Design a protein with these regions (language model features):
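Charge-dense, helix-prone N-terminal extensions
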Residues: 1-124
Length: 124
């Protein structure tokens, strides 16, 4: 760890998100424009034009923002569920169980949903 990493570690404690998942997300988003990373929701979020598209979540899952009208269809996938934060379902947000068995293509399809939705929003 660098001194800067240690300073962050001292303030925030250990990183709670899945570093491998964050790296995979970073690769999948490499060709996107206006991508920034920010610690949010106990994880590492990837924002596009200021809007959070996907996040390597604190539970080892993928958190993504989707068109609320597509939520019911998307949660038919057994890996996906409505995201719950502090006991409240978040409209337009999904949690997707990820693990090493999830292919890059499958992960990419989920990321595409998040990217497509935030690209439909005006930049912040």
């Amino acid at each position: 760890m660098t001194p800067a990493d240690l300073a962050v570690f001292d303030i925030l404690g250990p990183m709670a998100y899945d570093v491998e998942l964050a790296d995979r997300l970073r690769e999948l988003l490499a060709d996107e424009h206006e991508v920034t990373e920010k610690q949010m929701f106990g994880g590492l979020a990837f924002l596009i034009a200021g809007h959070m598209a996907v996040c390597a979540g604190s539970r080892g899952d993928l958190l993504l923002r989707v068109d609320p009208a597509q939520t019911d269809a998307l949660i038919e996938d057994p890996r996906a569920s409505r995201y719950v934060m502090r006991g409240r379902e978040m409209n337009g947000w999904l949690g997707v169980e990820t693990d090493a068995s999830m292919s890059d293509d499958e992960l990419g399809r989920w990321v595409d949903h998040g990217v497509a939705f935030v690209r439909s929003l005006p930049p912040k």
